[in-house]
Amino acid sequence: MTKEQQLAERIIAAVGGMDNIDSVMNCMTRVRIKVLDENKVDDQELRHIDGVMGVIHDERIQVVVGPGTVNKVANHMAELSGVKLGDPIPHHHNDSEKMDYKSYAADKAKANKEAHKAKQKNGKLNKVLKSIANIFIPLIPAFIGAGLIGGIAAVLSNLMVAGYISGAWITQLITVFNVIKDGMLAYLAIFTGINAAKEFGATPGLGGVIGGTTLLTGIAGKNILMNVFTGEPLQPGQGGIIGVIFAVWILSIVEKRLHKIVPNAIDIIVTPTIALLIVGLLTIFIFMPLAGFVSDSLVSVVNGIISIGGVFSGFIIGASFLPLVMLGLHHIFTPIHIEMINQSGATYLLPIAAMAGAGQVGAALALWVRCKRNTTLRNTLKGALPVGFLGIGEPLIYGVTLPLGRPFLTACIGGGIGGAVIGGIGHIGAKAIGPSGVSLLPLISDNMYLGYIAGLLAAYAGGFVCTYLFGTTKAMRQTDLLGD
């Protein structure tokens, strides 16, 4: 049995056994477990399992085990359950243990009602953030892969211009790499439309068509469509993904209404046709111009804050981004990043935000040095630090800095210092989203690699010094405990 399989089985035992698990799924770093009875979960045992870097209680119990490991752990849990990831796990009861389904249903409804009430205050915001995450998180591997391939093409192109390399085959290779990159970035509106349709309950194919509509692929030469508000020609992609998401949301409403009123015999023909016609026209003549104005204004405001605020803005963004990640609010910036890339070829917000993770790495290094007697902490750091350098910060957040308290605050200060350096230098952008930390380096635009490295080093140093001096307690240094 592999260590990942052992980890999976220990997690199952800690959450009350397979009989207490309703379903299992995973993201990039966390196994997400929906349990039937929270009272059967042994939280302390779960947190102290070797390999578990943190535990978050939400709608699902989220067990942080790190990238790579998470897929193997989740897949083994799915194998043991006999169902696919995300599917409900059937629970069989023998005759001597007959289940009172009526009572069970009533208890389940009561629990769901209480959970719903507990989330009423932030319900709408949580729903928006969850929708944004569900639309874009599946695209992150494509962003990373396409972005890195585009970064390699840019490096090769620069080397050719400088005269270090030459040859027709190099030119062809650069062309091929750029074609692969554009396979994602040029058709992002279509991918966004498909995922938005899944999120809002529309037909994914129709969502892709609406996304593709914004590209105006049928417009050429004199067949120009005009912006009904300004009288200027509409531009392909105007309104960006903000317009696509809103249009697909309207599509979901229209399609659902049509399904209710169109006879079943002709539903497959009439509903998609009318839905595309209505929403397509609205998208071209209403949503694209309005969303274009919104996205242009949003990007202008963000760029203005970064360029005018400089060091101050950089510090505030870098210092506050880690708490936003902790709360899951960082997903709200994904559409902004993408719009900045669409309009100017780079997002100048991402390199500053990436300093938050670098500050946390510096804090973790200080903990490694200061807390030599704390073997539990050092064992956790062994798994969380390497991926932290690569920009995956959740294992450090939930497994180290947040449970300890003080190091989380000093890590934020380190992130602010790195952000101040990036903001002070200025014009340091990223050509794609997805990675951060060292992994973001190949995606830095306009050859501003040294500026980004300077920011990373400043964040590492700031997080290290602040944590070394102020971020530990006697208990952290002399006991073998992690958090409370």
Swiss-Prot record:
It catalyses: N-acetyl-beta-D-muramate-(1->4)-N-acetyl-D-glucosamine(out) + N(pros)-phospho-L-histidyl-[protein] = 6-phospho-N-acetyl-beta-D-muramate-(1->4)-N-acetyl-D-glucosamine(in) + L-histidyl-[protein]. It is a multi-pass membrane protein. Residues 130-484 form the PTS EIIC type-1 domain. CDD domains: PTS_IIB_glc. Its main location: membrane. Keywords: Cell membrane, Kinase, Membrane, Phosphotransferase system, Sugar transport, Transferase, Transmembrane, Transmembrane helix, Transport. Disulfide bonds: none annotated. The chain crosses the membrane at residues 135-155, 160-180, 200-220, 234-254, 274-294, 305-325, 349-369, 384-404, 408-428, 450-470. One of its GO terms (cellular component) is plasma membrane. It is an enzyme of class 2 (transferase). Residues 5-87 form the PTS EIIB type-1 domain. Disruption phenotype: Cells lacking this gene show an extracellular accumulation of the disaccharide turnover product MurNAc-GlcNAc, but do not accumulate MurNAc. GO terms for molecular function: kinase activity; protein-N(PI)-phosphohistidine-sugar phosphotransferase activity; protein-phosphocysteine-N-acetylmuramate phosphotransferase system transporter activity. The active site is at C27. It is found in: Cell membrane. InterPro entries: Glu_permease_IIB (IPR036878), PTrfase_EIIB_Cys (IPR018113), PTS_EIIC (IPR003352), PTS_EIIC_1 (IPR013013), PTS_IIB_1 (IPR001996), PTS_Sugar-Specific_Components (IPR050558). Its EC number is 2.7.1.-. One of its GO terms (biological process) is phosphoenolpyruvate-dependent sugar phosphotransferase system. Pathway: Cell wall biogenesis; peptidoglycan recycling. The phosphoenolpyruvate-dependent sugar phosphotransferase system (sugar PTS), a major carbohydrate active transport system, catalyzes the phosphorylation of incoming sugar substrates concomitantly with their translocation across the cell membrane. This system is involved in the uptake and phosphorylation of MurNAc-GlcNAc, the principle peptidoglycan turnover product of S.aureus, yielding cytoplasmic MurNAc 6P-GlcNAc. The EIIB domain is phosphorylated by phospho-EIIA on a cysteinyl or histidyl residue, depending on the transported sugar. Then, it transfers the phosphoryl group to the sugar substrate concomitantly with the sugar uptake processed by the EIIC domain. The EIIC domain forms the PTS system translocation channel and contains the specific substrate-binding site. This is PTS system MurNAc-GlcNAc-specific EIIBC component. It comes from Staphylococcus aureus (strain USA300). The gene is murP.
